[in-house]
Amino acid sequence: MYHPRELYPSLGAGYRLGPAQPGADSSFPPALAEGYRYPELDTPKLDCFLSGMEAAPRTLAAHPPLPLLPPAMGTEPAPSAPEALHSLPGVSLSLENRELWKEFSSVGTEMIITKAGRRMFPACRVSVTGLDPEARYLFLLDVIPVDGARYRWQGRRWEPSGKAEPRLPDRVYIHPDSPATGAHWMRQPVSFHRVKLTNSTLDPHGHLILHSMHKYQPRIHLVRAAQLCSQHWGGMASFRFPETTFISVTAYQNPQITQLKIAANPFAKGFRENGRNCKRERDARVKRKLRGPEPAATEAYGSGDTPGGPCDSTLGGDIRESDPEQAPAPGEATAAPAPLCGGPSAEAYLLHPAAFHGAPSHLPTRSPSFPEAPDSGRSAPYSAAFLELPHGSGGSGYPAAPPAVPFAPHFLQGGPFPLPYTAPGGYLDVGSKPMY
């Protein structure tokens, strides 16, 4: 038998089986040690063999102090060790789009969070100086809560409305260029525009999980390491900018923020005054849908007195949106763009195949001298005129008469095949849709 002091000498004098010494640890006074006394146990049966052990009641002593660790990603650093936030001397970080962030911060920045994830705007765009050009660094970003309050929009400003919800699992976004040399990071600004925010706690894509109606602060970390999963860290620096504080929402609450986002975000140009998603354009599209199809739109099919050439008679108002101010009244009939050939072309059918299913009956039909083709295994919902082959082609094995009207040679027996592809499964540029 061995005494624990002999087996574990590295534990130090703090781990003892005897009574704690009053002066051993000032943070653990003897009065508190009484509360941690073990319950009275039966007399050990091996006391005769361990006569040297102390018979005093066994108490718990204080644990030895733990060494200081670097701050974990996604957690607040310890205020007693501010030097741990910047262990890369000479490295500085500046916010490139500071003026844009200040403009949003003066109103109260809001960031949309969705289940699928939504990108931040404005995005964090920084420039770094003072790095070792030959060393490798990692750029990381995380988002931490600013305080322990939940906020609510009160018509003109945000006000605290209660205690914050429990903190969600912390996640860190790693810049896709990491790890890279210091010369690479200092060559141009570093953008975190791909960061996405979500409110789904079960998100499998690695997006940053946030609570709605809470105030958050992005942090940018710069870590010196040779590899992405390296265990040998050469230093770390964390940076925060007061202008980047925002409140996470599922829908914009402040109308001024909505206008700023539309004016500054290049991807929101459709919501501007003359954009496709402005109120005027949306109302015009609704009116066109309620008006229904124009009666003159189908009369252009099969007009045989038009000159030959490329035909695109199916491109109506649903594809090319016209100016709502020039839209015709419900009682007026607008003349559809006249085709330049005798019948619809292959491009027209590929764009709108459903438009030919109800084509009028006066379309040109198969020539009587053209015999019925053998069953090709699939039905042809369009007119038989589209199945005719040019004169002299040996596609069907029957003597073919000249077609009644000219048409583009895009259709073979049994249905359309994309050219120059010779087998089903090819893709066309029109809509990028597979034919089969």
Curated annotation (Swiss-Prot):
Record's keyword annotation contains Phosphoprotein: no
Cell location: Nucleus
Biased composition (Low complexity): 325-339
A Pfam match: T-box
UniProt-annotated stretches for the region Disordered: 271-339, 360-379
Major localization listed first in the record, in broad terms: nucleus
Assembly: Forms a dimeric complex with DNA (in vitro).
Disease / disorder: Spondylocostal dysostosis 5: A rare condition of variable severity characterized by vertebral and costal anomalies. The main feature include dwarfism, vertebral fusion, hemivertebrae, posterior rib fusion, reduced rib number, and other rib malformations. SCDO5 inheritance can be autosomal dominant or recessive.
Protein name: T-box transcription factor TBX6
The species this protein was found in: Homo sapiens (Human)
